[in-house]
Amino acid sequence: MKANLVGLICCPDCGGRFGLVNARVKEAEIVSGKLQCERCAASFPIEDGLPVILRSDARSDRTRKSFGKQWKMHDQKRFEQETIYGKKKEEGLRDFQQAFGIGEFASLRGCVILDAGCGSGVLTADIAKAAPGATVIGVDFSESARLADARCRELPNVHIIQADLSRPPLAARTFDLIWSEGVIHHTPDTARSFSSLAPLVKARGKLYIWIYSKEVRSPYRAARRILRKAYLLPQPALYALAWTLALPLHAANKMREAMRTTTIRHRLASTAYSFYDVLSPEFMHSHSRMEVAGWFRKHGYGGLRFSRETPDIAVCGTKE
């Protein structure tokens, strides 16, 4: 943890400022100690350089462990090798630029950016490298925050936090840009998680989310409906199930591709990872465009831009 992160975070219980207690510093990094609220005295550990600002409960523990295992397997290349959900690194950066209408990353100098649900930190690191003049904060609920921290530790403009997005340890009106792709629909209450993120944006700042649409029908979501309790399976069984389901779908896709009725983006490993992604979480919600637009307007956002590049809901709003 870098010392200047303390000025960017706050107590999730009362919003008070944090002080450092028993901090041990190694090569300009705070590697252990505690963050203690100066108002309510709540404290949270710094573990191997990672601030862990969480409260535990049984339901959230299951979700945290599930996504932690998923990202660890991806990092170990047990699914895809060089892509995430079939996308290469440059495609992730292009999506980020398009979502916010960014021309050049150099224009982000001085901006504070939140990657809300950063997973293992691949995109977080790529954004920080592309925009070295910006400050990038990655937050994830799961143990994958440790992977993100290891990946980003040498980048001077990145901070990683393990925290709950429904109770973020971040002050209102802190961020110029908030990016949250495929994350808040896996929380117990999507609208509540959105309501926790929305106030964090500065005036004229932008908030982007990507979540599942109620209108979309796909083999992945059909599998989720049929196997809705699959998240209770042991991880090895769930891993095997994802690959088992992927094989016939991949074969069918290749046949369609050979007949030139479609161009299939995903390779077999990406298909298996997508099945694992929909079967492993306890929570998975879908919403309508009208519903999501209402969330943005309720929190003072205008200029909504819905992407046409996905059948799901990808939308960016500007804080008025």
Model feature map: region roles:
Residues 206-237, 247-251:
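Conserved class I S-adenosyl-L-methionine
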